[in-house]
Amino acid sequence: MSSINTNVAEKHSYKERVNTDASSLSADGSVEAHRLTIEQVAKIFNTDIINGLSTSQANQTLKDFGANTLGDGDKISLTKIIAHQVCNAMILVLIISMVIALAIKDWISGGVIGFVVLINISVGFVQEYKAEKTMGSLRSLSSPTARVTRNGDDTTIPAEEVVPGDIVHIKVGDTVPADLRLIDLMNLETDEALLTGESLPITKNHLDVYDDYSVPIPVGDRLNLAYSSSVVSKGRGTGIVIATALDTQIGQIAKSLRNNNSVIRKVDKSNGKPKKREYSKAFCGTIKDIFYNILGINVGTPLQRKLSWLAIFLFWGCRYFCNYCNGIPKNRVNKEVAIYAICVALSMIPSALIVVLTITMAVGAQVMVMKHVIVRKLDSLEALGGINDICSDKTGTLTQGKMIARKTWIPNVGTFNVGNSNDPFNPKAGEVSFVNLSPKFIEETDEEIDFKQKLPSPFPENFNNWLLTATLANIATLNQSRDEETGELVWKAHGDATEIAIQVFTSRLNYGRDSLIENYEHLAEFPFDSSIKRMSAVYQSLQTNQIKVYTKGAVERVLNCCTHWYGHEENDELYDNQQLKELTDDDKHLIESNMNALSTQGLRVLAFATKDITNSSIDLSNRESIESNLIFQGLIGIYDPPRPETAGSVKSCHNAGINVHMLTGDHPGTAKAIAQEVGILPHNLYHYSEEVVKAMCMTANEFDSLSDDEIDKLPVLPLVIARCAPQTKVRMIEALHRRGKFVAMTGDGVNDSPSLKKADVGIAMGLNGSDVAKDASDIVLTDDNFASILNAIEEGRRMSSNIQKFVLQLLAENVAQALYLMVGLAFIDDSGLSVFPLSPVEVLWILVVTSCFPAMDLGQERASDDILEESPNSTIFTWEVIIDMIVYGFWMAVCCLVCFVIIVYGEGDPYLGVNCNKSSSSNSDVCELVFRGRSASFATMTWCALILAWECIHPYNSLFYMRQDTDHPWWKQTVIDLWDNQFLFWSVAIGFISVFPVVYIPVINTKVFLHGPIGYEWGLAVGFSILFLAGSELWKWIKRIHKRKANKKAKNPEYELERSDPFKKYASFSRSNTMDRPELMV
């Protein structure tokens, strides 16, 4: 097939290419698809309704029409990135300092500060630009997807790759990826409020054709079209793409909305005509927003905002401190005071922190992609490290999502078993065997049951009727096609995994949907709904004209609709009985006991029912009447095996201090069996009290019936909630929050969006998740795998740990410099002014140049081996970090101060010169002693800062014993550990060496850095650097002693058992209550 067009400019010129009347085209040459039949639209777009476009056809059309996006709405704004670099408190402090320095004609300090500002902005710009590109590509991975048919195969592609002519399938929760001419649907309704303003969903009809060209049809009345960006609120449908990107109806609106963003707050007009107060409130709010945006305290991640507030607080605190100490008592607020205020303020501002944080998060987001995790919101990177409870769905997340029908029970017939089949799509694989006993009887008997290899022939009538219901209450399809790569015939399936499993089972017995559907007319369908957990289809036989309802769903929900069945006895007297019996409560208990027998095997059990419709006047749109007075037919047990890695991941979560909760729509028995198999529930429930066992596994009805106070009094929140509804998930999150938990919640359906937003971290499924769920989530799993959640948490903890490391390193240096400079106020020269023990340029060099690169490299440290065995931590600024920051900073300041004092005062009466704080008046002879002291203390502080970077790798372990479990001698292990992060190694090494040229290069040393060459002072700098290292090691040794004492207090037999058994804390050593209740035991 040829492409629709040869270039974009001709994409609307269909007149020369199709055999259709010109009246079917609008004024601009685009197709008015709502006025055409399905066949005409398919011909215009040169597509096949069954097989869709070919791959080559789709690729060429994509080149011709471009990507299916609304233009450059997500285009990276270079202006905004630059503004973001300038408008944060830390950069603004540097800019203010630069302006002050230039205003008092300290040109060199002002120029150096300006250069540092330029470097910060440049590095920040490059990194944020890269981060924006990375996040843009990640957002495109998690953006709405479309399920299309190409080459006869159903495949999921990014919505932006959809092209005109594609056959697109939509279902509940999907965002329509493009404008569609509907060709097939069932109870399809879409929410078009975004487009038309209509608050109610619009019911679609693909058979409508508006061929009267004299009557204009408004957009909202074109019921045979589905529009891009509308959300499917009910049913399902299939359509041909007729417009993409800006050619869609929503695209036309997008054009008109361009450049309509405003930072101006709107005036509140909700109470009628606004008064002066409303205008004043809007004006003041606008000014506040602009001011806060400039300072960067209401943009960025929570940590970035905290750092901006910290910068503002420290800057003004230091300013007033310096003014008071150096100027106000003497009424001498002059240039010297201003310069010293600048110097101290700079020493307190971690100038490189924002840049380092941005780079770390951008790299972390890229690492997440390799672990099948897409980060949609950077805030979630900070939150992941603090997760201590995960609420996960079962199907497809904890399990493989590849369902295979294993057992079927037909009352008064027996149990059918499928064996030797692990191919979920191939109806020819495996063997179906039979025994005329119920699952309950098989479970209770001690005898070995011999399943017959031959099926009853002919099939019992009740089994035939059940097969018919299983086939028709099902929209999954199977087909065999030739694989393009291997050329072999392979089985392919389209539809829901559960329905595919049922369809494969019926096809094994020659009851495939394709062979039966041509004999029936599909009259109505009521799709599966998570609130009622069943679906029904209404068909009319073309041979007998008989109308029948076919229903399947959760056993208890289907039984509630049933009034009759054919009975059941464990003997041959009523074999294949055709006489209807009223369904009594005892009968329902019997059916439920058979369901339990299947569910305890880990099978997901569904029930089937049917009824004849004899009243021709019945309303086929009334679901309640259609699904009433049904005849129960039988059960099917579907096995969805756990993923091989799930059990190990759950165990790792328990070791990491993370509780795992399964919130599933399955039957309690199935949920409990799978939960025990993967380790969410303990196997031996008799170890626990009756109260705890009841709380561990509950149904949604039981949980929802409890008040908040009753939930809070439970000994443990449920580890498994079966038959879970969307509102149950929200209540579970609220209950966890009340217990101070930090919660991650998984979801895939449109109804999961409230719980995803409520959770601290919302996790959507990338493969089977709806677009609405993805949009509400913080992260998206590209493989729908529970193990990927653990990977995300591990990476989140690594990032949080690394952020703590470089925050500690940078802020400890700030503390050291601030203390050092504040004490330096005591050094008075001959003019009565304080002498800087460090010059402003030295301060900036240490903070920005020397420390920035080691900090960035600390951000890339590998996770420690035991990171998942540590307790969750939801904050960066822990008391341990704060105390470490003060201790390291204080000790560094002491080392530098003593070094300076020894040099200046060691030779007797010191001479601190005159105006040694100004580059313009510096004199090497007058200020020689001060310059030598500065050089030595500068070298000491630089080397101490670099040593601190290595010390921050591990909060407790010695620099010489980073890894305790090694057979290497200490010196060899130290080399291995330091070389492990080669970027950090070379940053530190180059930082050590860089001190020498800065001290010795003429002009730069005396005019810029305000220090001079030194000799024996190098020995002092080396000695005090080693002293700092020794003090740091001593502090870590004290911390290790304290930690060991704390652990000894915690160590006892129960503690050790709890480490190996995460459920030990729930154990009751009085087992009588539970053992007296067999139904609580497994």
Swiss-Prot record:
Deletion phenotype: Decreases the rate of potassium efflux from the cell. Sensitive to high pH.
GO cellular component term, pick one: plasma membrane
UniProt-annotated location(s): Cell membrane
Extracellular topological domain residue ranges: 97-98, 330-336, 829-832, 906-935, 1005-1007
Transmembrane segments: 76-96, 99-119, 309-329, 337-357, 808-828, 833-853, 885-905, 936-956, 984-1004, 1008-1028
PANTHER family: CALCIUM-TRANSPORTING ATPASE
Name of the protein: Sodium/potassium exporting P-type ATPase 2
Organism: Schwanniomyces occidentalis
